[in-house]
Amino acid sequence: MPGLAYHAAMSITLSTATYKLAAHLPRQLPADSGREVAFAGRSNAGKSSALNAMCNQHRLAKTSKTPGRTQQLVYFEVQPERYLVDLPGYGYAKVPMDLKAHWQAFINGWLQERQALVGLVIVMDIRHPLREFDLKMHDYAHARALPAHCLLTKADKLGRGAAGNTLLAVRRDLGVRGTVQLFSSETKQGIDEARAVVTNWLQL
């Protein structure tokens, strides 16, 4: 069936993703060319698990029980000049204020100026959606006219009716600032839909 072949092709495409580099300084970034899709979300929102599920790899992005463990921009190369970028979780780990300020300045500058950035995937725990930093990420995308797609992760933690109601509420509140879907790394709900968005942005 054509539809099944299409989904399989998308899975294979993202499953080629491999670790490229981690950067905590501008000079460590790859050349600002090609196409990059960033993944952002609160600590413990399930961002690393979502990346792993979408790429059909268990250990591509490291998951941690410690909030804010990802402290750098982590680049995964899907194809030459086609990257998935894992941003530090907001609500950073307990670190010195000067280090936290450095991260914030670095990430803010990257979001505002990176020309290769073509889309932002914003990962939110469905039980705690649209917190302050989630809205700030949507504002970054909207200010740059970048598409934003929201994953309401851990959808399996709510009943079907409650999950559907949350989806409708978030969709209403976001308005034109982004699209939104249900997602679960555990049950695989929404993985094909999320892959389709990302592969389209990367022009794969």
Language-model segments: residues:
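Switch II of P-loop NTPase G domains
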Residues: 29, 67-74, 88-118, 126-140
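Conserved nucleotide-binding/hydrolysis micro-motifs of P-loop NTPases
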Residues: 24, 69, 82, 89-92, ...
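Conserved G1/Walker A P-loop phosphate-binding module
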Residues: 6-94
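Conserved C-terminal guanine-recognition region of P-loop GTPase G domains, centered on the G4
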Residues: 108-178
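Glycine-rich, phosphate-binding/catalytic loops in enzymes
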Residues: 56-57, 100-103, 137-140, 166-169, ...
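Residue-level signal for inorganic ion chemistry
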Residues: 76, 153, 194
